[in-house]
Amino acid sequence: MIDPKLLRQDLTELKQKLAKRGYELDVDFWQQMESQRKSLQVITEDLQAKRNAGAKQVGVLKKNGEDATELLAEMQNISSEMKQAEESLKALQDKINQAALQIPNIPADDVPEGSSEEDNVEVRKWGTPRQFDFKVQEHSDLGEVLGQLDFAAAAKLTGSRFSVLKGQLAQLHRALIQFMLNTHTVKYGYTECYVPYIVNSDSLEGTGQLPKFEEDLFKLTNHTNNEAMGFYLIPTAEVPMTNLVRGERLDASELPLKFTAHTPCFRSEAGSHGRDTRGLIRQHQFEKVEMVNIATAAQSDELLEQMTGQAEYILQQLQLPYRVVKLCTGDMGFSALRTYDIEVWVPSQDTYREISSCSNCGDFQARRMGTRVKEGKKTELVHTLNGSGLAVGRTLLAIMENHQNADGSITIPEVLRPYMGGAEIISA
């Protein structure tokens, strides 16, 4: 949530900043809300003052042995009016808060302006895409010929946008998870977490998925009456890990907190009809190793650079060419103020595809969660950061395609061989 003070001050400037990311701020609505809030606040404070003054008068009358019946009746009316005014003020404040939850984060000043991924800015590249001397196969074909990637079985079990891995590909998938977690914990000092895959609505509101993006989530219902239970499958481990500090007051000496976890992620892909329908690019269920940092305001910018570099290191060790792009204002996620995407080279598509997104959310999520840090006498909101380190399925497909051989076998990257009993090749 953005700072509520901004909605009471220069709305024109705020409108301009939010317009950069394609959000139209309703200035008239917010001016009306603030006018009503001030009016109800004045009424409530006036009634409070009258009640306090009346209470003193009653005390004086009783002390002097005088009749206070009439004044007590008047005070009862004031109390009734005050209760109504307070209820009206609370209802209005709830309406204001709900409306504020729909407003995205304000982009940082250095974020390039733009409306789509076409306006993202390339920051750097690593590695050179391999020149093949045979016809490149896409990962779905490679996996099916190997007999180790089965979309038909997944469709029978569940439906479209699911997959079944078998044999060495399933082992490679597991090896990637172990390698990623070991890298983040041993090399970079993250604390590994095991978290619930089901969260409540407060958690999703804290990180910004609710209330605006409910259609992207899988919501649990009671099978006996089909009523919502208030629980959702996680779309990313960012949600439970960031919410570990919801409502907490931390000490500056504790920060940064660095969490990592491997979880399945569940997404409805509501807006992706017809896109990437084949293969592992876009699934309803996929695995991801996530990184979350909880930091002070002074730490967060540098931590974003570090986190992005940590995700890059994984790709470098796997010998996968990639590029880093800074997302433009119109392509950033709802909660982010600055985001780097890492895109891995996919030979069959002759292009780079997103494999990691690393974001600094500033105090946007912290304000929603009520998470603060105390440094000396000063208490302020923490900053939160999150990043994929990495999306496992997309890393798997990148290995399959970039390290494929003419006979349809796949060369296992050296760093993964210890996790696969020393095997060097995946073959039928």
UniProtKB/Swiss-Prot annotation:
The reaction(s) this protein catalyses: tRNA(Ser) + L-serine + ATP = L-seryl-tRNA(Ser) + AMP + diphosphate + H(+); tRNA(Sec) + L-serine + ATP = L-seryl-tRNA(Sec) + AMP + diphosphate + H(+)
Pathway named in the protein's UniProt entry: Aminoacyl-tRNA biosynthesis; selenocysteinyl-tRNA(Sec) biosynthesis; L-seryl-tRNA(Sec) from L-serine and tRNA(Sec): step 1/1
Pfam family, one: tRNA-synt_2b
GO molecular function, one term: ATP binding
Superkingdom to which the source organism belongs: Bacteria
Chain residues that bind ATP: R267, S268, E269, E354, I355, S356, S357
Enzyme superclass (EC): ligase
EC number: 6.1.1.11
InterPro entries: aa-tRNA-synt_IIb (IPR002314), aa-tRNA-synth_II (IPR006195), aa-tRNA-synth_II/BPL/LPL (IPR045864), Ser-tRNA-ligase_type_1 (IPR002317), Ser-tRNA-synth_1_N (IPR015866), SerRS_1_N_sf (IPR042103), SerRS_core (IPR033729), tRNA-bd_arm (IPR010978)
NCBIfam families (UniProt xref): serS
Oligomer status and interactors: Homodimer. The tRNA molecule binds across the dimer.
Entries under HAMAP family matching the protein: Ser_tRNA_synth_type1
Protein name: Serine--tRNA ligase
